Amino acid sequence: MYGFEALTFNIHGGYLEAIVRGHRAGLLTTADYNNLCQCENLDDIKMHLSATKYGSYLQNEPSPLHTTTIVEKCTLKLVDDYKHMLCQATEPMSTFLEYIRYGHMIDNVVLIVTGTLHERDVQELIEKCHPLGMFDSIATLAVAQNMRELYRLVLVDTPLAPYFSECLTSEDLDDMNIEIMRNTLYKAYLEDFYKFCQKLGGATAEIMSDLLAFEADRRAVNITINSIGTELTREDRKKLYSNFGLLYPYGHEELAICEDIDQVRGVMEKYPPYQAIFSKMSYGESQMLDKAFYEEEVRRLCLAFEQQFHYAVFFAYMRLREQEIRNLMWISECVAQNQKSRIHDSVVYMF
């Protein structure tokens, strides 16, 4: 359904919406994936990708290729598309596009802090960071000993600063506290993004509410499964769940007390949209859960393109391109390690 935004959307957003729909048309199809799965080596993959949007990014790469090179160059395509859209955008679209970066910024902070804890080289860690999540003071994250220092020395001048209000403790950074920090930051980020989209109203609010609610629910399930058998209490677990989504609040109450994967399954099967996801798994199995969630996410992201005059297409395109890069990384790894029998295990088809 279109509201009054359809009358004026094209003044500032029409050009960029046309651009992003053009980018979407360049995503790999099932036929492309079938061809890639037949490749015998990474040079074959490069040859198949030469006819796609990635061609110009890979054409000057010498043999022998490595999986990391393919992923790096494909990610560069994503970053270039994003930067082009951002520099053309006006408010409030530019703020919406900035929100898309924040998840990568959180991941980069966690990567640097965790790596430093395990005495990894800072420069090596920075090279592994996602380019969309980079910020000026990222290298100085290594000096922080606890959450307060992390905030005071580094993050106070970044867009993540407001999300740190829940994690400002003097406890030393260890693996458990870093994971709690990651999930607390993500909770604050998702809730903030959700509120921003609600303020925008119209089709943007409607479609983004569905996409962000799905993300919040998926994170709630993953937090529950990953915290089974750890020292995280039920109350601590519940604090990490986002305060919106299909599971909020009653599903959260039930997830907080789950003690194994089958109990999680029992909770999720009460919610029809998630029933199909869990029906694909055997009892006691969680290995295929990530793929099932990714497939459902891709289905919802593709539906975002069925309507016009809204910002959700930008979010959907970025997520679909990220999924495509995950697919290419998996295919490349399977080919490089001669594990072609497993090549279809993690590929999520889009079109």
UniProtKB/Swiss-Prot annotation:
Q: Which GO terms describe its cellular component?
A: cytosol; Golgi apparatus; plant-type vacuole; plasma membrane; plasmodesma; proton-transporting V-type ATPase, V0 domain; vacuolar membrane; vacuole
Q: InterPro entries per the record?
A: ATPase_csu/dsu_sf, ATPase_V0-cplx_csu/dsu, ATPase_V0-cplx_dsu, V-type_ATPase_csu/dsu, V-type_ATPase_csu/dsu_dom_3
Give the subcellular location.
Vacuole membrane
SUPFAM superfamilies assigned to the protein according to its UniProt record, in alphabetical order: V-type ATP synthase subunit C
The coiled-coil regions, if any, are none
Q: A single GO molecular function, which one?
A: proton-transporting ATPase activity, rotational mechanism
Gene3D superfamilies in the record, alphabetically?
Answer: ATP synthase (C/AC39) subunit, domain 3, V-type ATP synthase subunit C domain
Which keywords annotate this record?
Answer: Hydrogen ion transport, Ion transport, Membrane, Transport, Vacuole
Q: What is its main location?
A: membrane
Q: How does it assemble?
A: V-ATPase is a heteromultimeric enzyme composed of a peripheral catalytic V1 complex (components A to H) attached to an integral membrane V0 proton pore complex (components: a, c, c'', d and e).
| Function (record text) | Subunit of the integral membrane V0 complex of vacuolar ATPase. Vacuolar ATPase is responsible for acidifying a variety of intracellular compartments in eukaryotic cells, thus providing most of the energy required for transport processes in the vacuolar system.
Query: Which family, according to UniProt?
Result: Belongs to the V-ATPase V0D/AC39 subunit family.
Q: Please identify the protein, giving its name as recorded.
A: V-type proton ATPase subunit d1
Q: Which organism is it from?
A: Arabidopsis thaliana
